[in-house]
């Protein structure tokens, strides 16, 4: 949570020095979310309650093209699939990322757009299962790509997103190993743009 607050402070701080631009408050739900571990472990689905809340600051650099940055608290640690010998829970994420958004001028109130995010995911989800062993979450790259529509400052979008991650495992006898834990999903999001400046 501390990383999310720092990220929001950076986003709002950048906006306070800007003459124009916008802040978007947003949230979303995950569709088909699943952790991918590689060939040695079984992939696991997350619960339907997974999603995110966050904020972005963007400013227009050329007509239709906005760039900026954002952060979010993404909650997806709770697993629907329980697999013997694997985590009972995984990690939540706090990404910090740059973003680019292009809105098409349709000469109507409804304007479609495409969007891409790229940054780093701070993953939080260490677990100690006693005799089974300890699992420590590590961060990795974060990206998202997709599109949506804007109507009267309201954005509705559909994006494919991935948080790269790893787990370090330490067994009861001190045996250590690492494995990938990449979280992939389609995100259905809704946001509202607050315009700054003139």
Regions found by a protein language model. Name each.
Residues 4-13:
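Sec-dependent N-terminal signal peptides
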Residues 18-59, 100, 118, 125, ...:
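Short glycine/proline- and aromatic-enriched beta-strand/turn motifs that initiate or cap beta-hairpins
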Residues 21, 45-53, 90-96, 110, ...:
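Residues that define the transmembrane beta-barrel architecture of outer-membrane proteins
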Residues 22-31, 41-96, 155:
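Glycine- and aromatic-enriched membrane insertion/assembly motifs of diderm outer-membrane
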Residues 23, 64-67, 107-110, 151-158, ...:
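Repeated loop/turn-to-beta-strand initiation elements of outer-membrane beta-barrel proteins
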Residues 23-27, 69-71, 98-100, 114-118, ...:
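Membrane-embedded beta-strand positions of outer-membrane beta-barrel proteins
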Residues 35-45, 79-87, 124-134, 166-176:
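Outer-membrane beta-barrel translocator domains and adjoining extracellular loop/strand segments
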Residues 36, 74-80, 143, 148-198:
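Predominantly the C-terminal beta-signal and adjacent terminal strand-loop region
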